[in-house]
């Protein structure tokens, strides 16, 4: 299966994403180590192979524009036979996050998670992919653990 390719080029960023159903392999280079880590986790736990290359002026611009590019790439990579709804709860040490997803074409995000940058990533991703996502932080104190559990869920 050929990967879906989505590119975004603005005054602030240049992003290229390839996505396809696969084994959850990831090749990610955004210049932001934590974002690379989250995109690798998203690929692994979704079973979607992702190749992401991103450059930009500010961390905030890169994070948002990666979301705006990964969203449609994943949406287009899903087969028409994919289940519309899904839910998963993921623990990460003291953190526990529940995600409920609808890929039916109605963009909406209900959070929050305790990081304004990555909460904004989720909202931008949902808007661009036209997905509905509800995230509930059931437990947790470490922001890294909560955000990572959210991406894995």
Regions from the PLM with identified roles:
Residues 1-153:
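Polyanion-binding surfaces on beta-sheet-dominated domains and ring/shell assemblies
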């Amino acid at each position: 299966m050929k990967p879906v390719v989505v590119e975004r080029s603005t005054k602030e960023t240049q992003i290229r994403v390839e996505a396809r159903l696969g084994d959850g392999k990831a090749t990610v280079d955004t210049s932001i180590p934590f974002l690379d880590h989250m995109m690798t986790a998203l690929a692994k736990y979704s079973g979607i192979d992702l190749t992401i290359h991103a450059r930009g002026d500010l961390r905030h611009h890169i994070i948002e524009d990666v979301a705006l590019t990964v969203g449609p790439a994943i949406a287009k990579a899903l087969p028409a036979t994919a289940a519309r709804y899904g839910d998963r709860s993921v623990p990460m040490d003291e953190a526990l996050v529940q995600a409920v997803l609808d890929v039916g074409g109605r963009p909406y995000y209900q959070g929050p998670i305790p990081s304004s940058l990555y909460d904004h990533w989720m909202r931008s991703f949902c808007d661009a992919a036209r997905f509905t996502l509800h995230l509930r932080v059931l437990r947790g104190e470490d922001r890294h653990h909560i955000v990572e559990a959210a991406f894995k869920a």
